[in-house]
Amino acid sequence: MQQTVIEKMLVISTGHLPKEVMDDTLAQIDNQIYIGMTREEGCLLHIPSTEIEKYSPDLYYIMEFAQHQQCEWVLFDRDGPTYNNLPTFDW
């Protein structure tokens, strides 16, 4: 019998990224530079196991936060929760 694989995902508001970083992230996913999928409400982004420091500082900080929660994915959702320990941006 094959083992079931389950991966954790951090759900977070798109407001934790500046608009230009979110727009760039969506473009990088669409261009298959980042692994994920875009959606009207935000995006689903895979967190690579290495070299997350090459991402923008705002995105890196969220990826690092997600990794500390043992997450392999981040779901950015416009209606997602905000976290007091992370900066937020108005757009």
Could you tell me what each predicted segment is?
Residues 53-91:
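Short, compact, well-ordered microdomains
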